[in-house]
Amino acid sequence: MCGIVGAVAQRDITPILIEGLKRLEYRGYDSCGVALYMDGHLRRTRSTKRVAELSEQVAEDKLGGFTGIAHTRWATHGIPATYNAHPHFSAQGKDEPRIALVHNGIIENHEELRQELQGVGYVFESQTDTEVIAHLVNHLYAGDLFEAVQQAVRRLQGAYAIAVFCRDEPHRVVGARQGSPLVVGLGQNENFLASDALALAGTTDQIIYLEDGDVVDLQLARVWIVDQAGKQVERKAHTVQVHTGAAELGPYRHFMQKEIFEQPRAVGDTLQDIESITPELFGDGAYKVFKEIDSLLILACGTSYYAGLTAKYWIESIARIPVAVEIASEYRYRDSVPNPNALVVTISQSGETADTLAALKHVRSLGMQHTLTVCNVVTSAMVRECELAYITRAGVEIGVASTKAFTTQLTALFLLTLALAQTRGRLTEEQEAEHLKALRHLPAAIGAVLALEPQIMAWADRFASKENALFLGRGMHYPIALEGALKLKEISYIHAEAYPAGELKHGPLALVTEHMPVVTIAPKDALLEKLKSNMQEVRARGGELYVFADADSKIANAEGMHVIRMPEYYGALSPIVHTIPLQLLSYHTACVRGTDVDKPRNLAKSVTVE
């Protein structure tokens, strides 16, 4: 959610800090700020506007320096306001500020610490839990910032990534992480901190991924890391090539539109070099794990949860293995019955989703040790924590509403389905060849659906004036209806709900009027005739149907029923293909309504706090 950038160098780092914040804007924020060491003093500029305006303000204030930190904030404690924006300073009494600090996460015992610090004379200027950490570090400071931070984090309960520097030690930045991502960037006589390697693209490609409990001391020519026990540790540096072109719009109006149209490439890349189905696609030892398990437990949040629901249909019908799909934030607090023979599958675009990581640690504590993740970031915490992994190749996704990450997750989960089926003797050579042929044609099939954009834009003009919408699907297309409803509400702010079409008579039909658009996914599968009956129920109540129907489904335009014909029925992979028009409908409806498509209100791209 929030973003951190920090640096210590022998050159003016202000442009690096500002550019880093710009690269982190996609994560979502409501305020931003930068602090630097200048001529023996701490100086800062903060804003509740965009980073571009902050940059102008920094130039007007003539800020510059060799040591500093910067931050984009997403409000958790305290309203979006300049006095709550980071960086926070700490001084005792009327002294000049000595400590500057930024923080991502939530400190659960901040009220207790606040009272303690107020009792020894610290005055709070904000409503944030972050200012508590700044004052705590200052209170514990006795000439060594690294030692003060180590002492301070031992007092913190909750999740955090912090970056801090001190007026009295101007060539030093200290960072720490627990449950929130933080990376170190290595340079020549300069070093950097960030919450995401993307922030350092163009500055360094040498990245160290800190682990939970790590505290790092950055100086000009030295990086020193200690673990939770205070023991010095070595963390491997990775060469990370971040393609900065992902942050360029090109001919597109928004990043979401660009990413929708990148899906043929993203799905093709995710399938790259796959010539046959084998468990080893998911890592060494996958065959043994797949033979030992008797069920799957899928843990995910948001859009990734809907990918898991879709996979349940595939895995149970093709591989014949029972599957449970759980919302990660709920599962970890539920008194569930652990099964040590289950394969736990986590799904996350970033690999840093706090609730999913916490649920993963929870199941491992219950003795469930077979773990696999489907993730878009090879260096993420989730990949490091799991026994097996499949890395999607969606590329950087900047729009808050997930598009290409979702379809590449589905692609990877279908591969998992086939690998499980093969391991259990439920996939013949002929079936494998047929499925591989369909997968290889999938990018072209998605491209054919993207060509329907002009027709979908016409629907969006009708949708834009609505305040409610209903989405219907059956079978493996029901999770796609859920995803379609989520997309519409995320970016257009139209209230939308999704139901299995067979549930209409059990409540949702009461909402159907001539003012309620009903979006229906109508593939030519075994449930089509049942779905047609559900559609007639909507028409009989005056509802207006918007139907995505396969070409040979014999559903035609009529009064109260608008039909867009999909190019072809795509069998088991139909849910992936039917996702695309729902993305386009949501996108163009939001455009007509004039919302901030890439940065919808109140939402963040990467949810790294619980």
Swiss-Prot record:
Catalytic machinery residues: 2, 605
GO molecular function, one term: carbohydrate derivative binding
Localization of this protein: Cytoplasm
The keyword ATP-binding is annotated on this UniProt entry: no
Enzyme class per UniProt: transferase
Residue stretches in coiled coil: none
Protein name: Glutamine--fructose-6-phosphate aminotransferase [isomerizing]
